[in-house]
Amino acid sequence: MALRLRSGGIVNHELLKAVEQTPRTLFAPPQYQDEVYSKRLIPLECGSFMEGCDMAVRLLHCLNLKPGQRILEVGTGSGFTAAVMGRIAERVLTIDRYQTLVASAQKNLEKAGLRNVVVRQADGSAGVPGEGTFDRILITAAFNSLPRTFSDHLVSGGTLLVPIMMSETHCRIVRVNRTGSRFDREDLFDAPYLPIVPQVASFL
């Protein structure tokens, strides 16, 4: 896997080390254990999915993670990406609208030995009031346009990675870097994300 990631341009040693220290088998459903390191999407509960290994690591590589950072993730899923970020960063807050996924991810993170990752059920479309600012923000549900709420959560020098719906069927990963009051946008690559659903789920 490491050789495949390196050949795909992932050369950040600290990120690769964090990925190797975080077994994806702890985060995937039992019936998909043989495919955890493949490029395919792995179905989760509540209609969610776990990104293919290459896509997950590519997203984290685009964030340029560093020790000491505070990170926000919107869309917890299995908890895998939060776990990898937790190996590098000082603190990770990850939120999801589904309590089922929150509870499952919490168990997965405990099995992986992560103590600096906080998992919370919250409305991912509304930001995280009262949580202050973050060095990095990763969003894994698509918005129709750049979400100002999350841009305001960035420190100067911070980076936001968010899927943006370019059309009804076309989604692209966009990176936003903040410098003071200036926000610089960079369109990166297409990705298979679905539009974000507002409000927390009532029954799942």
Curated annotation (Swiss-Prot):
SUPFAM superfamilies: S-adenosyl-L-methionine-dependent methyltransferases (SSF53335). Its EC number is 2.1.1.77. The keyword Mitochondrion does not apply. GO terms for molecular function: protein-L-isoaspartate (D-aspartate) O-methyltransferase activity. One of its GO terms (biological process) is methylation. GO terms for cellular component: cytoplasm. The keyword S-adenosyl-L-methionine applies. It is found in: Cytoplasm. Keywords: Cytoplasm, Methyltransferase, S-adenosyl-L-methionine, Transferase. It catalyses: [protein]-L-isoaspartate + S-adenosyl-L-methionine = [protein]-L-isoaspartate alpha-methyl ester + S-adenosyl-L-homocysteine. CDD domains: AdoMet_MTases. Monomer. Belongs to the methyltransferase superfamily. L-isoaspartyl/D-aspartyl protein methyltransferase family. Catalyzes the methyl esterification of L-isoaspartyl residues in peptides and proteins that result from spontaneous decomposition of normal L-aspartyl and L-asparaginyl residues. It plays a role in the repair and/or degradation of damaged proteins. NCBIfam families: PRK00312.1. This is Protein-L-isoaspartate O-methyltransferase. It comes from Rhizobium meliloti (strain 1021) (Ensifer meliloti).
